[in-house]
Regions:
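C-terminal regulatory/interaction regions
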Residues: 1-6, 12-15, 237, 241-249, ...
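Conserved beta-strand hairpin/beta-sheet module of binuclear metal-dependent hydrolase folds
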Residues: 2-52, 211-237
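Flexible, acidic/histidine-containing loops and adjacent segments that form or flank the divalent-metal
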Residues: 2-3, 78-227, 315-361
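Active-site environment of divalent metal-dependent phosphoester hydrolases
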Residues: 13-15, 36-39, 63-69, 96-99, ...
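Short, solvent-exposed loop/turn segments that connect beta-strands within catalytic domains
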Residues: 22-28, 82, 312-314
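Long, well-ordered mid-to-C-terminal structural blocks that present hydrophobic/aromatic surfaces
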Residues: 219-274
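His/Asp/Glu-enriched short active-site or ligand-binding loop at hydrolase and phosphoryl-transfer sites
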Residues: 284-289, 321
Length: 361
């Protein structure tokens, strides 16, 4: 049996993944997001993806800059190819937003991408789906079993209905959360058990950033030798609701090899009750520490993973980072204190202790 492999790319404060799947005699490549920068030194996404002659599925989980820029660049580079190298694209983009080509605005990039994808699709070169939500039919995919678990139909409909209005209001939202750095600093001195018991803020669909993340595509992929819960920047309540509806519970947990932690380890994109119905010891966190108003991961997120009620503390938790921990901590401060060692965890980056189904560049 061939070994499927999840490749975890350094993507600054964003996400970029390549999954090479095998299922029996079939194999295929899935690309998930593309990071925030077109500089190949800072974001190796373009160079790595160009090594793949044929991509079976490309997923842009949502249209924030830190997920879309590399994918947008790849599509622009190949849009005029006689044979477009991607079979399918899943992009829940706001294509109805009539805005000119611009720079450094996620919505403008998504609209420009939508125009391009429409032309490629109309020419019969690829299959573009712009309405991917929980329960989306993936039965014709032969190289892996893929189950889309978020967003819900209701959330995605709200996204399309409200997008233009919220985009217009985006400039009125605070550009900087001045309390974030102070909170991060205070959290360093709070024990993880206490942090894990904090109440989470609920997403506000009337805020642009929250709505975009609520519409993020989350899915489970299963192939030979690999299973992963890929959460994009989704919020936990919707993911948990879907899983419980499918019969998962504290007594019948979802078993996966890896969880790609949502939103780079942001504290409000995880919950104890979601973790309680997942059986997994390997957690992937994609971040270099964040940028601007973002400080990732939150120590509170690590606390949830290590201290939620349903955890079997006899099994070590493995955290996989795509940047050395000391680089991340230069921005967010110390994530683990000396007394945290008792919680039984192991830190990994590309230089130490990777399982054979995970690769970190």
């Amino acid at each position: 049996m061939s070994q499927s492999v999840l490749t975890f790319l350094p993507a600054l404060h964003g996400d970029a993944f390549i999954i090479h799947c095998y299922k029996g005699d079939n194999d295929g490549y899935i690309i998930v997001d593309g990071g925030p920068n077109i500089n190949s030194r800072l974001n190796p996404f373009i160079n790595e993806v160009e090594k793949i002659s044929h991509i079976d599925l490309m997923i842009m989980t949502h249209q924030d800059d830190d997920h879309l820029v590399g994918i947008k660049k790849y599509i622009e580079r190949h849009k005029d190819d006689v044979m477009f190298p991607v079979d399918r694209l899943w992009v829940n983009s706001a294509r109805f937003v009539d805005m000119p080509e611009g720079h450094n605005l996620s919505a403008i990039k998504a609209n420009s991408m939508a125009d391009t994808l429409r032309k490629i699709g109309d020419a019969g070169k690829t299959q573009w789906t712009e309405y991917v939500c929980a329960g989306f039919d993936t039965s014709d995919i032969t190289f892996a079993d893929i189950e889309v678990i978020a967003p819900s139909t209701k959330t995605l409909s709200l996204f399309f209905e409200s997008y233009e209005t919220l985009l217009a209001q985006k400039g009125l939202e605070p550009a900087m959360n001045l309390s974030a750095s102070k909170r991060v600093e205070k959290d360093r001195d709070i024990d993880l058990q206490t942090l894990s018991e904090r109440k989470k803020a609920k997403p506000n669909p009337e805020k642009y950033a929250n709505l975009v993340n609520m519409a993020s595509i989350a899915f489970i992929v299963r192939s030979d030798g690999l299973s992963a819960l890929m959460l994009g920047d989704s919020f936990p309540d919707e993911v948990e609701a879907y899983l419980r509806e499918k019969g998962y519970s504290e007594d019948n947990k979802l078993v996966v090899d890896f969880v790609k932690v949502s939103h780079h380890g942001s504290r409000n994109n995880i919950s104890n009750t979601l973790l309680d119905i997942i059986d997994c010891v390997n957690y992937i966190i994609s971040t270099n520490g964040g940028e601007k108003k973002s400080y990732h991961p939150d120590r509170e997120t690590l606390a949830n993973i290590l201290c939620h009620k349903g955890r079997d503390r006899s099994k070590p938790i493995h955290f996989f980072f795509n940047y050395p921990l000391n680089i991340i901590e230069q921005r967010v401060g110390k994530l683990f204190n000396d007394e945290d060692v008792k919680l039984n965890y192991v830190i990994h980056d590309k230089n130490n202790g990777l399982p054979n189904n995970l690769r970190i560049l």
